Amino acid sequence: MTMGLRAPHWVAVGLLTWAALGLLVAGHEGHGDLHKDVEEDFHGHSHGHSHEDFHHGHSHGHSHEDFHHGHGHTHESIWHGHAHSHDHGHSREELHHGHSHGHSHDSLHHGGHGHAHREHSHGTSREAGAPGIKHHLDTVTLWAYALGATVLISAAPFFVLFLIPVESNSPRHRSLLQILLSFASGGLLGDAFLHLIPHALEPHSHHAPEQPGHGHSHSGQGPILSVGLWVLSGIVAFLVVEKFVRHVKGGHGHSHGHGDRHAHGDSHTHGDRHECSSKEKPSTEEEKEVGGLRKRRGGNTGPRDGPVKPQSPEEEKAGSDLRVSGYLNLAADLAHNFTDGLAIGASFRGGRGLGILTTMTVLLHEVPHEVGDFAILVQSGCSKKQAMRLQLVTAIGALAGTACALLTEGGAVDSDVAGGAGPGWVLPFTAGGFIYVATVSVLPELLREASPLQSLLEVLGLLGGVAMMVLIAHLE
């Protein structure tokens, strides 16, 4: 019971810690936006002032009254046109082009305007060049920062996993493991519906308003439909892989489903903790009444009562079959870490500050996600050390994604950070894999009979996993 009561405390402490870090990140973003707005206002004021001086000096420089009158009319219209274009954010090239067309004395006007325009261009390039020097790092420093941040994100969750008092899928750890599994299911579903799928749709929502009204209604449906199809493709692909692996594993025993149901004596020591599929649930409901089950089986179970524990082939077969869900989760996590690596590499290409901010956001996202993956692997039959080693393998995907982002030239950094990096099918396909693992492998484990307190803790764990993803989605 103490083990069961420790888990909510860990979840609560984790929620408070990650929430505090999230508020710090949100405060940093708000400060940056305010600073950017002040800079924009100051730049717009200085631009208008310099142009006003130029207009005054230019109207002062003409001596012929009739030409000045004609020019004043033209210049007034140009000034009006510039004010309109300035409100819309157009550059100075349009004003210079209008002056060149409107005046016959091109040499005098072009000379006076060219001096003022050159001064303004110099000031603008100097202001724009300073952030470029700050943000764009040299190659060695860029790779060091990006790969170091990726290693940090991959290694940081292990410190949390060391604190989880679960060594294996044993009865004394079962209540805590069930709570961690519920947290994992909430994290997987929240990650799929609040992070991966919205980011897959985000590039299309950005491009849609730029299109004409007639094209928006037709072209906007195609990309959105493709995202939904890729999500379904991920679910179907994971289903096909699991059925194929189970068929191959069950080929040695002629019929896997029949063999598992035929050997209930074996499953009462191993299967109550490892069975994930629906066809094995009838045996799990009867495992608590071992004596009654043996009486029901009669002569079939009598001869097997003795050699149940030493019969390692049956146990290995059941354990290996039930680890399929764990390996499927690892495959989905590998693809997900690849997208995280793409985001980190692309953000550091945009600047050190943006890279650090993205690293903190991904770290907040990865810690609860890795805890859930650890619970799924332990539930699938791995020991604590095996589960941590397998999770370390998924760090290869993050490093590969970071390297791809650093080696790829071009592309908008904002779209990469938003999750649009890489092929458009990666995010929705990964989301489909997460949905499959959460609904097929994890949620059925939460349907077993449990005490009211245990059931309440499991529901709270699921809501805690979703709440973490809501917080992270808000920060992003």
UniProtKB/Swiss-Prot annotation:
Induction: Down-regulated in an insulin-resistant, and high-fat diet state. GO terms for cellular component: endoplasmic reticulum membrane; Golgi apparatus; nucleoplasm. The modification Pros-methylhistidine is found at H73. One of its GO terms (biological process) is intracellular zinc ion homeostasis. The chain crosses the membrane at residues 7-27, 146-166, 177-197, 222-242, 393-413, 417-437. Residues 110-120 have a biased composition (Basic residues). It catalyses: Zn(2+)(in) = Zn(2+)(out). This is Zinc transporter SLC39A7. It comes from Mus musculus (Mouse).
